[in-house]
Amino acid sequence: MLTITSYFGFLLAALTITSVLFIGLSKIRLI
């Protein structure tokens, strides 16, 4: 149970970081 929870949390964190980096690159390109 703990392994699944930590894996889900890690996946969510990775997705969030990827989204933030993608949005940041998009803003830089637009500017």
Swiss-Prot record:
Gene name for this UniProt entry: petL
Molecular functions (GO terms): electron transporter, transferring electrons within cytochrome b6/f complex of photosystem II activity
Homology family: Belongs to the PetL family.
The name this protein goes by in its record: Cytochrome b6-f complex subunit 6
Taxon lineage: Eukaryota, Viridiplantae, Streptophyta, Embryophyta, Tracheophyta
Keyword Membrane listed: yes
Record keywords, A-Z: Chloroplast, Electron transport, Membrane, Photosynthesis, Plastid, Thylakoid, Transmembrane, Transmembrane helix, Transport
Function: Component of the cytochrome b6-f complex, which mediates electron transfer between photosystem II (PSII) and photosystem I (PSI), cyclic electron flow around PSI, and state transitions. PetL is important for photoautotrophic growth as well as for electron transfer efficiency and stability of the cytochrome b6-f complex.
Main location: plastid
GO process annotations (BP): photosynthesis
Organism of derivation: Arabidopsis thaliana
